[in-house]
UniProtKB/Swiss-Prot annotation:
Secreted recorded as keyword: yes
Residues where Ca(2+) binds: 43, 45, 47, 64
GO MF annotations, alphabetized: calcium ion binding; calcium-dependent phospholipase A2 activity; phospholipid binding; toxin activity
Stored Pfam families: Phospholip_A2_1
Protein name: Basic phospholipase A2 DAV-N6
Tissue: Expressed by the venom gland.
Catalysis: reaction(s): a 1,2-diacyl-sn-glycero-3-phosphocholine + H2O = a 1-acyl-sn-glycero-3-phosphocholine + a fatty acid + H(+)
Length: 138
């Protein structure tokens, strides 16, 4: 279900923030967010609960925590300035919210890139009901 929601959001907001995050993920991993990360493990994609399944899923958990710390921002919808050069993502000048959202996304994309070796296809499209353990705290 969360995968369908992500796809719908991406189709509606083609110029929005989620597409920016997808581009960062593509830069760092050479994989598109959909289908590789939109419903991976217990935390990659919309929402999250339970315990991260591996280091890749932990990147998404930390990203969720980063978003939770932002106050007065709309991290899933705000558009922010950024650039990249030879695989390095640089968050640009913008509002304080834009800078913080960009840094959350940049850190997650870098983390996913650094943990490509932990990526397991068995966690792609992982069903939410299998994420039963008590949720990890931020």
């Amino acid at each position: 279900m969360r995968t369908l929601w992500i796809v719908a959001v991406l189709l509606v907001s083609v110029e929005g923030h989620l597409l920016q995050f997808n581009k960062m993920i593509k830069i760092m991993t050479r994989k598109n967010a959909f289908p590789f990360y939109t419903s991976y493990g217990c935390y990659c994609g919309w929402g999250g609960r339970g315990w991260p399944k591996d280091a890749t899923d932990s990147c998404c958990f930390v990203h969720d925590c980063c978003y939770q710390k932002l106050t007065g921002c709309s991290p899933k919808w705000d558009i922010y300035p950024y650039s990249w050069k030879t695989g390095v993502i640089i968050c640009g000048e913008g509002t304080p919210c834009e800078k913080e959202i960009c840094e959350c996304d940049r850190a997650a994309a870098v983390c996913l890139g650094e943990n490509l070796r932990t990526y397991k296809t068995k966690y792609m499209f992982y069903p939410d009901f299998l994420c039963k353990k008590p949720s990890k705290q931020c």
